[in-house]
Amino acid sequence: MDADRIVFKVKNQLVSVKPEVIVDQYEYKYPAIVDRQKPSITLGKAPDLNKAYKSILSGLTAAKLDPDDVCSYLAAAMELFDGTCPDDWTSYGILIAKKGDKITPATLVNIQRTDVEGNWALTGGLDLTRDPTVAEHASLVGLLLSLYRLSKVSGQNTGNYKTNVADRMEQIFETAPFAKIVEHHTLMTTHKMCANWSTIPNFRFLAGTYDMFFSRIEHLYSAIRVGTVVTAYEDCSGLVSFTGFIKQINLTAKEAILYFFHKNFEEEIKRMFEPGQETAVPHSYFIHFRSLGLSGKSPYSSNAVGHVFNLIHFVGCYMGQIRSLNATVISSCAPHEMSVLGGYLGEEFFGKGTFERRFFRDEKELKEYEAAESVKTDTALADDGTVNSDDEDFFSGETRSPEAVYTRIMMNGGRLKKSHIRRYVSVSSNHQARPNSFAEFLNKTYSSDPR
């Protein structure tokens, strides 16, 4: 019989079926540029820059912006921000610019234009007869791109977080080298009238292009990045979290993965480290692949690597990190099991400190110290890891090898110890939990645990 089939009875009738599930037709897509052409978009006819400025500024003042006109203006304004390429700049086999070339944000991409005229209406509330200065253009560009960052702020953020962010960004574009062009709080008012700027593909593309340019090129107006920085590694929260995790525990990626004791990590680790990607290439198109339209469904998002994401943030919660406590649990990716593993790893890598001597009076003292430490290491590696630290308060967990940590988990029946639960409850109960956050999960799951 087919090994994939199961047999059972329905009303005394023998039934044999092959269980199958719906195949996800919307597969994860790795960023790639197969034709060696720069990322491109198509916009309407290029406007007169000064006329466009006056139209967009009047729309911003009246909180009535035409997205197509905004995108057309942002693309046209790129010519105002020129800089010198510090080195040969290549990505995915494409030569973006050579060392010493004068470049603008438009150099990074291909912006095609049609003959379709923009609207360029004057909404009102503006009486500007003179042509704007470069500083005023820069302020308008900065304010428009700030709408992208505001639209990315989660609705779960409590209090006045979004208003405070808007105020800080406006303050940047009111002071030199920028110029004040609108009344304070205009940005937040405009955002409320259209809160979904990050979902407009062309606007997202231009925000990513500006960010990619200013992240590499030193420029008088680099502060424009305050609104676009969220396009860097967008939809890469799984990969970004893993990168931060290995820095915290001071291990290489290879060493860290040895502690991932769960079968569901296999597919995610394979997905996250697909060969041929420019994940470690500085200033690559990869960094902005979502905004530049190089991937429809990111394989590096928290949903794509949910078990890895959950584990990392449970470890972060164990250490009381606000970012982890506020993060949203991926509920379909074994959060209970990940919280157990997170407790053990949190204790092993953070709970006991990682202190060691690094500086010495002379080379002789250094060698003596290294010799003494090697003896301690040999002793630690011989430890079978069977000591229960709940029973022996002074057990220091000398070895943190994957084998020793795994043994400790198995010796406790794959369950958290009392000390882990106390720690989880302590950090989560003292935190204002957001809906579906790690703090809420830990509080609900372990606050009533009888252990």
From Swiss-Prot:
Source organism, top-level taxon: Viruses
PTM comment text: Phosphorylated by host CK2. Unphosphorylated protein N seems to have a better affinity for leader viral promoter encapsidation. Phosphorylation of protein N in ribonucleocapsid may stabilize the interaction with protein P, thereby playing an important role in viral transcription/replication.
InterPro entries on file: Rhabdo_ncapsid, Rhabdovirus_ncapsid_C, Rhabdovirus_ncapsid_N, Rhabdovirus_nucleoprotein-like
Residue numbers bearing the Phosphoserine modification: S389
Gene Ontology cellular component list: helical viral capsid; host cell cytoplasm; ribonucleoprotein complex; viral nucleocapsid
Keyword Phosphoprotein: yes
UniProt KW RNA-binding keyword: yes
Keyword line: Capsid protein, Helical capsid protein, Host cytoplasm, Phosphoprotein, Ribonucleoprotein, RNA-binding, Superantigen, Viral nucleoprotein, Virion
Molecular function as annotated in GO: RNA binding
Subcellular location: Virion; Host cytoplasm
Subunit structure: Homomultimerizes to form the nucleocapsid. Binds to viral genomic RNA. In nucleocapsid, binds protein P and thereby positions the polymerase on the template. Protein P acts as a chaperone on free protein N to prevent it from aggregation before encapsidating genomic RNA.
Similarity-based family: Belongs to the lyssavirus nucleocapsid protein family.
Function: Encapsidates the genome in a ratio of one protein N per nine ribonucleotides, protecting it from nucleases. If expressed without protein P it binds non-specifically RNA and therefore can bind it's own mRNA. Interaction with protein P abolishes any non-specific RNA binding, and prevents phosphorylation. The soluble N-P complex encapsidates specifically the genomic RNA, with protein N protecting the genome like a pearl necklace. The encapsidated genomic RNA is termed the nucleocapsid (NC) and serves as template for viral transcription and replication.
Miscellaneous notes: Displays a superantigen activity in human and mouse, activating mostly V-beta-8 subtypes of T-cell receptor.
Descriptive protein name: Nucleoprotein
The organism of origin for this protein: Khujand virus
Gene label: N
